[in-house]
Structure formats: C-alpha cells, structure tokens
Amino acid sequence: MKTQKPILSALLVLMLASACGQAVTPTIEADPPTQTVTLPTAATQPSPVPTRTLTLPGAPTSTPTATPLPSELALDPDEWKSWPVQPILTSRIAEIYARGQELGNDPNAFSIFGDCQSKPEVFMGVYETDPDVIAALPAQLQETVANFTGSFNRESPTVKDATTVAGLLNPIWHEGKYTCTLDESPVECELRIHNPSFVFINTGTHWITRNQEYLETIIQQLLEAGVVPILATKADDRYQGEKTNQALANMAAKYGLPLWNYWAAALVLPEHGLYTKEGQGGLGDVYLTDQAILIYRLSALQALDSVWRAATGQ
C-alpha cells in the first residue's frame, strides 16, 4: 500500500505532549455502559503467581452460538459512555476478515497501534511471558492466547511513547527502525512486517482538531488491507480525551467496527484507575494503577477473543 502523498505533503514536526509524555511528534495539520464491571477485591486479585481467574461481567465464558450477527451496531455514538465494555459484534467483522484471508493476512497475528499504555510490559505481553498467568485464564481465553502467540510481547513501529494517529501516518515517526523505510508510514510498515488480521487502535491524544479525520484515514487503510480494527476508548481526559472517545464511537458506528470500551471498564476504579507519575506532574493522571492494569489487560484479551471468534465463525 502506498503512502498517501497529499497527506504526507502537509506533515509538520511539532513538540507536543501526549498521554505518555513529551516527544517530537509528527502532525498533519497547521491548525493548532450500562454494563457493570466489578473490580476484584484484595482477596480475588491475582498475585504475582495467579491462583484464580479474574472475570469481568459480560465477558465470554463459552463458545458463541451460530446466531447470525447484526449488520450494524445499532448504537448511538453520542451515547458511547453507556456502550458495553466488550464489543458489539457485527457481520462486518467476518467480511473484513475474509477479505484479509484472500489477501494473505496471517490468521494468527494481531498488531497494536498505541502509546506507552500499549507497550508489552503494560498491555498484554504477560500473556506470552508468564505461564502462570496464562494457566489461570479460562480455557477459551487460553485458546485465544495460543492462537496469537508471537503478537502479545513484540515491539513494533506502531507502539511508542506519545504515539498519536497523526504520528502513525508519518514516516518520520518510526525513525527507520524495524526495517521501515521513509517511503512508508508506521502503519504501512507494520502491515508489511507483521501481516496482522486484527489491529487494536489504542493511541494517545493531542490538541489538534482533525484527530477523527486521521483516525478514519487509518481505518480505511486497514479495511483496504482486510484487517479488522478493534477500537479502544481511553480512560484519561488528556487533551480532551472524551472527544477522542467520541471520534472512536463515531467510526465504530459508521463502519460497523468493534469498540472495546475501556473507559467504561475503568469507571469502578478510584480516580478512573489513573495516577500521576512522580516527576511528571505536568501530565496529570494518565498512568494506569496496578488495579487498572489487571482490568485493562483482561478486558482487552476478552475483546480480542470475541472479535476473533466472530471473524472466524466460531
């Protein structure tokens, strides 16, 4: 897939702060649930070697039936705060996936587009590095982990501190690492080197006014490549994070895409599961607490599980 020249011709390099810190971040413009999630108690939270399973209400606990999926979400994007934590599944997922299989996408690979909260040590790397954590999962989720082994704990050109949707479209952002070239954006490079069938879009935010436009550009690239996007809402309000979540809901409704509503999952946590890291007071509460990380990881894995099974007709 070729980089969109009209977009790249407008790229500028500016200093800005994302949800993870400050970085030289490329930008593409001149303009400046009703579902309840129960937090595990101290008695039920996994220890470093988990002895029991953390289960979130609404999570898949058995193999889905063959009931036909709806063709659209039938949810109001303006009411995204009341959307369930786990994605509403539509028939669109299987259609996108089928196209990807025709194009040769790897059915055992997923990618992540995100900032510091998407690094393997914070996000889902543990599902590849800690056998005890894996063994504590329900059998269905263990099957999902096995299917996608090799994707949970990898570094990539699309995961980096301060990554935004603007950065993902700029060849400068990958710094020429991971065999990426200056003729391809981080998105294009990741699709080439990892060839995923699914992608979590879990990026940070900044002040620019055209986030939704850039988000839609990325979504269209993924759809053209037959890759199923899994959109992820954010818990913090850094740079008006609710506007970012609104844009994600708009895109989910427009294209019939799965949305993992982590914002809703974090509602039960003190301070929304966020804290200010020492020495980084200027960023505010943007880092996940230990309690939040437990829910963050598990609810993401559950989302991957349900979307994968919808895509493959399980």
Question: What do the predicted segments below correspond to?
Answer:
Residues 90-94, 188, 212-219, 245-249, ...:
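Extracytoplasmic/secreted envelope proteins and their assembly/folding machinery
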Residues 238-314:
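Catalytic His-Asp segment of secreted/periplasmic serine-dependent ester chemistry enzymes
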Residues 200, 204-206, 216-248:
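Active-site segments of SGNH/GDSL-like serine hydrolases
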Residues 106-109, 194-200, 223-230, 255-258:
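Loop/turn elements at helix/coil->beta-strand transitions in domains of secreted/extracellular proteins
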Residues 103-212, 284-285:
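Conserved SGNH/GDSL esterase-like catalytic core that processes O-acyl groups on lipids
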Residues 120-122, 208-213, 232, 238-243, ...:
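Extracytoplasmic/secreted cell-surface and envelope-processing proteins
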Residues 1-105, 113, 122, 132, ...:
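Intrinsically disordered, low-complexity Ser/Thr/Pro-rich tracts
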Residues 83, 87, 104-108, 177-185, ...:
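Soluble non-cytosolic domains of exported or imported proteins
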